[in-house]
């Protein structure tokens, strides 16, 4: 594997290998050493979970790590990201973890520079977040073991969610039994890759084994979609009452950051069914597996 850009570019066998390798790292704490490999983290959007877990993954693998501070870099002088990568590559850096607001940017960089560097997509606009899909599936398999009988519900702003896009794809690749995308009509995607869409919260959650709650993007609510927070809260929030429609042992997940009291209640986020912190933990091991697969190949 030369680059890690989209789930759609991976075979089901490659995905399953990443999942098993992540669980191996978690349970054995036996990590390979790649001390000769240098990696740079370029985050053009704010991040806590993804940025830090990638850095921890890199350090667990004994890689040399460079974190580019955009505020003090030549990016403030107008340097294009393509030139930044070429410059860093000339210094001996081969691997680049990149988050950017532009859809498809990492793919474009891989097309232009792919002969000399390895690109890892840490999120591009509303398009894809492949490492999140891997860690989410690690978390689900760890708890539920099998996927073919599961009903998974994903709730929120599906239209603008790179998390939802990548998750639909991984569910399709791995043969998840049923995927339901629950969203107000105004946030429903024009194209669904896998699963079905509904704006009926209770029906969508009925009998679910896993419930994934997405962040409400307040900036889009106020500027683009003219959907107020009170409406969303009253009709689509994950509360103890709405969660009761799912199975009693349903997992509750959230990619973070959470808007408590908007898309999810604190009593649900912190409750016995919550696997949100387990997702964060698994993110480190999932990203270790991703990095190893690039270096080893």
UniProtKB/Swiss-Prot annotation:
It catalyses: carbamoyl phosphate + L-aspartate = N-carbamoyl-L-aspartate + phosphate + H(+). L-aspartate binds at residues 77, 162, 215. Gene3D superfamilies: Aspartate/ornithine carbamoyltransferase (3.40.50.1370). NCBIfam families: asp_carb_tr, PRK00856.1. The keyword Transferase applies. One of its GO terms (molecular function) is amino acid binding. Keywords: Pyrimidine biosynthesis, Transferase. Its EC number is 2.1.3.2. Pathway: Pyrimidine metabolism; UMP biosynthesis via de novo pathway; (S)-dihydroorotate from bicarbonate: step 2/3. Belongs to the aspartate/ornithine carbamoyltransferase superfamily. ATCase family. The keyword S-adenosyl-L-methionine does not apply. SUPFAM superfamilies: Aspartate/ornithine carbamoyltransferase. Heterododecamer (2C3:3R2) of six catalytic PyrB chains organized as two trimers (C3), and six regulatory PyrI chains organized as three dimers (R2). One of its GO terms (cellular component) is cytosol. GO terms for biological process: 'de novo' pyrimidine nucleobase biosynthetic process; 'de novo' UMP biosynthetic process; amino acid metabolic process. It is an enzyme of class 2 (transferase). Carbamoyl phosphate binds at residues 49-50, 99, 129, 132, 256-257. This is Aspartate carbamoyltransferase catalytic subunit.
């Amino acid at each position: 594997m030369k680059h890690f850009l989209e789930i759609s570019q991976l075979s089901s066998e490659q995905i399953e290998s990443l999942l098993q390798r992540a669980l191996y790292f978690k349970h054995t704490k036996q990590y390979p050493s790649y001390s000769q490999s240098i990696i740079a983290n370029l985050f053009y959007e704010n991040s806590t979970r993804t940025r830090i877990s990638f850095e921890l993954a890199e350090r667990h693998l004994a890689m040399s790590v460079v974190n580019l501070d955009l505020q003090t870099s030549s990016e403030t002088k107008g340097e294009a990201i393509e030139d930044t990568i070429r410059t860093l590559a000339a210094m001996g850096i081969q691997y680049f973890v990149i988050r950017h607001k532009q859809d498809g940017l990492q793919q474009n960089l891989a097309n232009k520079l792919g002969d000399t560097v390895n690109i890892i997509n840490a999120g591009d606009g509303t398009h894809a977040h492949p490492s999140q899909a891997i860690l989410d599936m690690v978390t689900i398999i760890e708890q539920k073991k099998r996927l073919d009988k599961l009903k998974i519900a994903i709730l929120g702003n599906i239209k603008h969610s790179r998390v939802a896009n990548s998750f639909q794809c991984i569910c399709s690749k791995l043969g998840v039994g049923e995927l339901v995308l629950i969203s107000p009509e105004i946030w429903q995607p024009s194209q669904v890759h896998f699963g079905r869409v509904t704006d009926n919260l209770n029906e969508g959650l009925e009998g679910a084994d896993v419930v994934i709650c997405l962040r409400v993007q307040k900036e889009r609510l106020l500027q683009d979609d003219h959907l107020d927070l009170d409406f969303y809260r009253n009709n689509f929030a994950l509360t103890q009452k709405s969660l009761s429609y799912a199975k009693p042992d349903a997992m509750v997940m959230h990619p973070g950051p959470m808007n408590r009291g908007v898309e999810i209640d604190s009593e649900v986020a912190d409750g016995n069914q919550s696997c949100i912190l387990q997702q964060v933990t698994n993110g480190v091991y999932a990203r270790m597996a991703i990095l190893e697969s690039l270096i080893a190949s």
